[in-house]
Amino acid sequence: MPPKTRAAGAKKVRRKEKKNVAHGHAHIKSTFNNTIVSITDPTGNVISWASAGHVGFKGSRKSTPFAAQMAAENAARKAQEHGMRKVDVFVKGPGSGRETAIRSLQAAGLEVGAIQDVTPTPHNGCRPPKRRRV
């Protein structure tokens, strides 16, 4: 019988290492249902992230511009703890929280450099969902 290494239920805790990154990228994915803000270093390693659901909004309130603002502020605050000062913004998706998230990154104290729209557009790929009839 192999010897037990850890007590039952004990988890191995991984410490967060303090990275010191002055310049990075902010990726804002804004869908119709949620907004996700990820702040990475220039190579793409995630330093901090937040989403409207992670900040505490549920259901249809996740898709509001205010929820996107709160998520961007939360991610910016965490990134500033790692020494982040300047970001280039990449926005993806058709959601309502795009502009609000960019403004709140600036308001949180991050200097916004370039803003780029990287929304994927199909070259007539999959059939889109049917139109809503209300």
UniProtKB/Swiss-Prot annotation:
It comes from the Bacteria. GO terms for biological process: translation. Keywords: Ribonucleoprotein, Ribosomal protein, RNA-binding, rRNA-binding. SUPFAM superfamilies: Translational machinery components (SSF53137). GO terms for molecular function: rRNA binding; structural constituent of ribosome. One of its GO terms (cellular component) is ribonucleoprotein complex. PANTHER family: 40S RIBOSOMAL PROTEIN S14/30S RIBOSOMAL PROTEIN S11. Part of the 30S ribosomal subunit. Interacts with proteins S7 and S18. Binds to IF-3. Belongs to the universal ribosomal protein uS11 family. Located on the platform of the 30S subunit, it bridges several disparate RNA helices of the 16S rRNA. Forms part of the Shine-Dalgarno cleft in the 70S ribosome. This is Small ribosomal subunit protein uS11. The gene is rpsK.
